[in-house]
Amino acid sequence: MAHGRRVEKVSALIRKEMSQLLLDGIRDERVASSMVTITEVEVSGDLQHCKIFVSIFGQDPKREEAFSGLQAASGFLRGELGRRLQMRRAPEIVFKLDKGMEKGSSVLDLLGKLEEERKNKDEISEGMNF
């Protein structure tokens, strides 16, 4: 059980430090000019591999640019994490694009449209009742 807690703790620490690095550690303009949010961090049981799920706000070309900037900076970020967390060996970092927020936004848009259509339908049916 202690092993699972350690993985969770390291995951939380990586998320915290990586968020800080995204704010002030990356000088790559592709990443610095984008709004990048870490949505989840998954660390393997042996602490050697780390998947970082990110959400990037913006249009598709800009999003892809920022994501490729993150991937290019993964070696630098791995080294910084190792120094900041004082780990003997920093985990290998893999970035994954999380489209959950995007999907949630589109669902909310659809629900809004349905509500509007329902109101219009109710207004029309009320107008027909004399």
Curated annotation (Swiss-Prot):
Q: Which domain of life is it from?
A: Bacteria
Q: From which residue to which does any coiled coil extend?
A: none
Ordered alphabetically, the record's keywords are: Cytoplasm, Ribosome biogenesis
Give the Gene Ontology MF terms in alphabetical order: ribosomal small subunit binding
Entries under Pfam families matching the protein:
RBFA
Q: Which InterPro entries match?
A: KH_dom-like_a/b, RbfA, RbfA_dom_sf, Ribosome-bd_factorA_CS
Which Gene Ontology BP terms does the record give? Answer: maturation of SSU-rRNA
Question: Membrane-spanning regions, if any?
Answer: none
Q: Where in the cell is it found?
A: Cytoplasm
Q: Which GO terms describe its cellular component?
A: cytosol
Per the entry, what this protein does is:
One of several proteins that assist in the late maturation steps of the functional core of the 30S ribosomal subunit. Associates with free 30S ribosomal subunits (but not with 30S subunits that are part of 70S ribosomes or polysomes). Required for efficient processing of 16S rRNA. May interact with the 5'-terminal helix region of 16S rRNA.
How this chain assembles, per its entry, is: Monomer. Binds 30S ribosomal subunits, but not 50S ribosomal subunits or 70S ribosomes.
What family name appears in the similarity comment? Answer: Belongs to the RbfA family.
Specify the protein name: Ribosome-binding factor A
**Which species is this record about?**
Prochlorococcus marinus (strain MIT 9211)
Q: Which gene encodes it?
A: rbfA
